[in-house]
Amino acid sequence: MTAQGNKPSSHDVITGRWTPSAADRAAGRVSGFGVITNIINGGLDC
């Protein structure tokens, strides 16, 4: 639940504390399940 590198905290995304930057929006990253899926990527996170 802690931000790691260039990934925001999944808790912050879920609770609405994270807001996408202009670069995030340009890359298609907006608040919601899709961003959570990208944060929890099955690597060391799982």
From Swiss-Prot:
Its EC number is 3.2.1.14. InterPro entries: Glyco_hydro_19_cat (IPR000726), Lysozyme-like_dom_sf (IPR023346). GO terms for biological process: cell wall macromolecule catabolic process; chitin catabolic process; defense response; polysaccharide catabolic process. It catalyses: Random endo-hydrolysis of N-acetyl-beta-D-glucosaminide (1->4)-beta-linkages in chitin and chitodextrins. GO terms for molecular function: chitin binding; endochitinase activity. Induction: By yeast extract and dilution. Slight induction by glucan elicitor. Transmembrane segments: none annotated. Keywords: Carbohydrate metabolism, Chitin degradation, Chitin-binding, Glycosidase, Hydrolase, Plant defense, Polysaccharide degradation. It is an enzyme of class 3 (hydrolase). This is Endochitinase 1A. It comes from Arachis hypogaea (Peanut).
